[in-house]
UniProtKB/Swiss-Prot annotation:
Residues 136-158 are annotated as: Disordered. This is Altered inheritance of mitochondria protein 11. One of its GO terms (cellular component) is membrane. It comes from Yarrowia lipolytica (strain CLIB 122 / E 150). Keywords: Membrane, Transmembrane, Transmembrane helix.
Amino acid sequence: MKFRFGEGAEGTLNTSVTTAMIDQEKRAADLKRRKNQMLLFGGATLATLASCRLTARGISSRRYIPKMFQANHMPPQSDMVKEAAMAVVFATTMALSSFSMVVFGVAWSQDVTSLKQFALKMKTKLGAQQIEDEIRNAPMTPETQDLQDQLAGALKKD
């Protein structure tokens, strides 16, 4: 294939070189995207490990260990509201960090980069696209056709 650069200059277009350049750019973008997904998953994993460690430390610090000759059936008085609030905080941080780790892990393994792409993949895997096509291509019932004609007529009058 020949093309002209200007007045009288001719050259040949090497399609294999341009294809290789495009493939290299795609690979670089793919590598960058996968690295970003890996870092998100790693961050969520670190958050999960940190929240588990803080929860374990919080639980062990509240455990009552009696000293020598102390009664073990009557733990000391404590603030129940504070302990309940801390339990909610610990449970929430563990649940959110675990959920984020699962979400980022699934997104990384399934190669999903956005919510729109996730929705499209789920539709294709669950067969929703085929069902939508069947409904779209289904013949209209006479009642539906009559209603559509009435609405079209009412909108044309205005």
